[in-house]
């Protein structure tokens, strides 16, 4: 797991052909906008969150974000414990995101 600045996260993501963007916010938060092409799994679903992660391809690189960077950091730690080796946390989260936004 690595905490990446907004610039590092966006730069790595743009060059990564093996990337999956993971949004761990709630449905209500996602309705306010999201990073394009992201997959949403709400971390507050507890075991449901873990169950969904278990279905994901561990060989991919995961770029994980939430509103401020706290939940996504927790999500990256959970992912590491489940055997995901490449989970990157977006420092500052969506509220500091300056890239493209979808609604």
Where are each of the predicted segments found?
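Rhodanese-like catalytic fold shared by cysteine-dependent sulfurtransferases
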Residues: 1-20, 27-61, 67-103
């Amino acid at each position: 797991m690595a905490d990446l600045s907004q610039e590092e996260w966006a730069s790595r993501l743009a060059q990564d052909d093996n990337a999956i963007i993971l949004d761990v916010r709630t449905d209500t938060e996602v309705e306010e906008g999201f990073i394009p092409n992201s997959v949403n799994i709400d971390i507050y679903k507890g075991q449901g969150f873990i169950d969904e992660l278990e279905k994901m391809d561990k060989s991919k690189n995961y770029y994980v974000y939430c509103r401020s960077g706290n939940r996504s950091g927790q999500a990256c730690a959970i992912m590491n414990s489940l055997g995901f080796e490449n989970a990157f946390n977006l420092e500052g989260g969506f509220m500091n995101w300056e890239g493209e936004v979808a609604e």
